[in-house]
Amino acid sequence: VAQLDTREKLAILADAAKYDASCASSGTAKRNSKDGKGLGSTEGMGICHSYAPDGRCISLLKILLTNSCIFDCHYCINRRSSNVRRARFTVEEVVRLTLAFYKRNYIEGLFLSSGIIASPDYTMEQLVRVARDLRQVHDFRGYIHLKTIPDADPALVEAAGLYADRLSINVELPTDAGLVALAPEKNALRIRGAMTGLKTAIDDNKDARKHYRSAPKFAPAGQSTQMIVGADAATDSAIVATSASLYDRFGLRRVYYSAFSPIPDASAVLPLKSPPLIREHRLYQADWLLRFYGFSVPEVQAATDDGALPLDIDPKTAWALKHRDSFPVDINTAPRERLLRVPGLGVKSVNALVRARRQRRLGLADLARVTRGIDKLRPFVVAADWRPDDRLDLRPKTARPVQGELF
């Protein structure tokens, strides 16, 4: 690796980290240094453009320890055979950068990942050292997310959990077949084994803390994972099924989806262009239907067309249009579970409606007060002053999405 100064390394390794989507700090324990002790906070409002599910804006220094790697995964810009400029931080440099960025109020924490150098154990040791030094030497109380390495010694992963708020292990691709084709040096069984070990450690720690107040916290924000979308032939139906299985088996806080981006000197086995970015967005919406709206995997899959989620409408609307017999729903009498199926109604809106209807019968004006707009809702609801016509041309009424840039 060429001799570079810290600024040059930061430019390379921050850019290399942009392909990792797993960087939200929701769910961690609240800590701050308002009492004059320690340094950092997980509570402040930073300058980040990422938002946690509870609505907090979070800012993280997101970097790689190094973009050198002994693996040669076809889809990865940092693969062994890639002709990219390489850089590597020392442990001390990452610690100094994190503290310097925090003191300037640029960040609330650190997201740290790495290519594999020398061996999985050696690389994992370096990541753990960063987190340990921040916590123990500098009393850093901000958020830390470490991307762990499946092939590393489980003892190193357990050590990481003592210092990091969240740990994550990437499943990489939605299917085992995709992993074999595009990352033959990685092993799906080892990845799932590492995720199982991490779940066990998290569960054991929760149990210990119920009985012993002095038990140290272990990855209090849990574990997450990420999969690349569009690099292989996996359908949205298959991706949804995989995600549901991951949530169920490993108690994940989040599954992140990252749209495949074409890379220089790409292998012939990769697609020539990236999937529409809106596809990634539709998968996140489907993910939320599973986690917060009571949809089953078959129900979400029923919203697809030949395994693909529609790009022009959201998955809940797609499901509703295929189940016209379930609508309209009376907002004054329907159970909460049915209200959650109405396109345009979110969890907070439904909860507000359920509370309000205990006091009076609700009309469209009440509905408008708890939603962004009622035009989308009108065909699917009955209110005290509204009953929709039985229209068949609902799909054209939905707004078409605008394709954004990947970066």
Annotate each predicted stretch with a short phrase.
Residues 1-68, 380-382, 386-407:
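Flexible, acidic/Gly-rich N-terminal and inter-domain linker regions that tether
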Residues 60, 73, 112, 169, ...:
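Conserved, mostly hydrophobic/aromatic
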Residues 63-92:
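Canonical Radical SAM [4Fe-4S] cluster-binding loop centered on the CxxxCxxC motif
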Residues 70-72, 88, 101-111:
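Short, flexible active-site-proximal loops enriched in glycine and acidic residues
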Residues 95, 100, 118-300:
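Conserved AdoMet/S-adenosylmethionine-binding subsite of the radical SAM
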Residues 268-341, 376-407:
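Long, highly charged, low-complexity intrinsically disordered interaction regions
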Residues 356-357:
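Residue-level signature of tetratricopeptide-repeat
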